[in-house]
Design a protein with these regions (language model features):
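Glycine-rich, basic loop-to-helix element that forms the pyrophosphate-binding segment
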Residues: 1-19
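A short, conserved alpha-helix in the catalytic core of glycosyltransferases
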Residues: 76, 80-92, 97-127
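Hydrophobic/aromatic residue at the end of a short beta strand that borders the catalytic acidic motif
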Residues: 8, 27, 32-37, 83, ...
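Short aromatic/hydrophobic "clamp" motif used to bind/position activated sugar donors
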Residues: 24
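Acidic donor-diphosphate engagement hotspot in glycosyltransferases and nucleotidyltransferases
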Residues: 11-12, 36-38, 103
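Conserved donor NDP-sugar-binding/catalytic core segment of glycosyltransferases
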Residues: 31-66
């Protein structure tokens, strides 16, 4: 659909716009579907009728504590989601200002503010390999560190009191700077770079700059 690396949110929005079905199944490349996962998700979609997102469960959380096979929740993880196209369009889809991280958290927040319903189906299961959908090593680590902090600041500014957010992240900037100095004294190049990327992502987001950083890798 695109030769350009659009980012998670913008790429999904493009697919949602082009889709001709009432539901769209968003799935990350590092996810393995368990038996009957799609079937169980579609069954719950037909049963519920009124939903914005239904998510399968992954291996990382103890969902056996859930009393019902289908339970309402505040938010889900974005690596596997069956979405209602109509509901997602109503709240403006994914925020394309976010390139990586917190996209689904932001979407779920807007859906809940619009009184939409989000569910998990513990009979629909996946295995999430976590960050193995890319194989670019240290470049991805740099990108991950930069965008993790950029997105955390952006999300906080979007939904919280700005004075508190700026105070909190200015303190964090100072801590990050101290860590950079610390790793310089240890000649630890990897940690110097990682902490510098976090510092840069935090600072750029605080200053209102876009999520511009991209790894030096050809995704085409």
């Amino acid at each position: 659909l695109s030769k350009k690396n659009l980012g998670y949110g913008a790429a999904n929005n493009k697919i949602i716009r082009k889709s001709k079905t009432p539901y769209v199944f968003i799935l990350s490349p590092d996810v393995i579907l368990k038996k009957n996962c799609e079937k169980n998700l579609l069954k719950s979609a037909d049963k519920l009728n009124d939903f914005s997102i239904i998510s399968p469960i992954s291996q990382y959380k103890d969902y056996d504590l859930l009393k019902s096979s289908i339970s309402e929740t505040e938010e889900v993880q974005g690596f596997a989601m069956l979405i209602s196209k109509k509901k997602i369009l109503r709240v403006g889809m994914f925020d394309e200002k976010i390139f990586l991280y917190a996209e689904e958290t932001d979407l779920c927040r807007r859906l809940k503010l619009a009184n939409e319903k989000i569910y998990i189906n513990k009979n629909a299961k996946v295995t999430h390999l976590a960050a193995k959908s890319t194989n670019i090593g240290f470049e991805f680590d740099k990108c991950r560190n930069w965008h993790w902090m950029w997105s955390q600041v952006y999300f906080s500014k979007k939904y919280s009191n700005n004075f508190y957010v700026y105070f909190k992240f200015i303190i964090l900037l100072l801590i990050q700077f101290i860590k950079i100095i610390f790793y310089i004294t240890l000649f630890n190049k990897k940690e110097i770079i990682n902490k510098t990327m976090r510092f840069s992502g935090t600072l750029n987001s605080l200053l209102g700059r876009s999520s511009w950083y991209r790894p030096k890798h050809n995704f085409d």
